[in-house]
């Protein structure tokens, strides 16, 4: 009986931890217009956090290329593009990586943190975190 209770506790704890993870699908919101723009899948690879665009919600730009993106991302389709690369966990935040703005092709330092289990704070900045912009993404079930 004691083992059963321990097992149930472990399963409950694992489910709780998963619901508190940044990993999953998120709806991105344009901070200027308030409109939903895309669905991004945040995933873990080799202990780092990455994110790729898995759906573009505006049919007019769904198959656009990232013409201004640097390096290997130049002229790649935005759909399927990795836009967050190499974030590391630092307490309650993920940082020390980059976020790509496919609209202008610029790379910014990036920090992610959960505001709640279904609301992700995404901060892109240059130099210090004070100089940048914040978006909130919402979990897609």
Predicted regions and their residues:
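Tryptophan-anchored aromatic micro-motifs
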Residues: 21-34, 53, 96-98, 137-138
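Short aromatic-glycine motifs in intrinsically disordered, low-complexity regions
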Residues: 69-74, 121-127
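Generic beta-strand structural signal
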Residues: 44, 89, 114-115, 139
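Short, surface-exposed coil-to-beta transition loops
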Residues: 35-39, 105-109, 123, 131-134
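Bacterial Sec-dependent N-terminal signal peptides
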Residues: 1-21
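Central antiparallel beta-sheet cores of small beta-barrel/beta-sandwich binding domains
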Residues: 35-100, 107-108
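Short polar/acidic secondary-structure junctions
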Residues: 31-33, 102, 113, 127-128
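Edge beta-strand at a domain terminus
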Residues: 117-119, 126-141
């Amino acid at each position: 009986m004691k083992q059963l209770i321990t097992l149930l506790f472990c399963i409950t704890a694992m489910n709780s931890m998963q619901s508190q993870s940044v990993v999953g699908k998120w709806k991105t919101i344009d901070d200027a217009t308030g409109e939903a723009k895309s669905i991004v899948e945040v995933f873990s690879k080799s202990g780092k956090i990455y994110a790729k665009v898995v759906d573009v919600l505006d049919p007019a730009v769904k198959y656009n290329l990232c013409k201004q993106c640097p390096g290997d991302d130049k002229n790649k389709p935005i759909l399927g593009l990795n836009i967050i690369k190499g974030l590391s966990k630092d307490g309650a935040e993920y940082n020390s990586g980059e976020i790509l703005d496919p609209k202008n092709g610029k790379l910014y330092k990036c920090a992610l943190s959960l505001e709640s289990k279904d609301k992700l704070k995404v901060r892109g900045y240059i130099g210090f975190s004070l100089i940048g912009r914040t978006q909130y993404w919402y979990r897609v079930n």
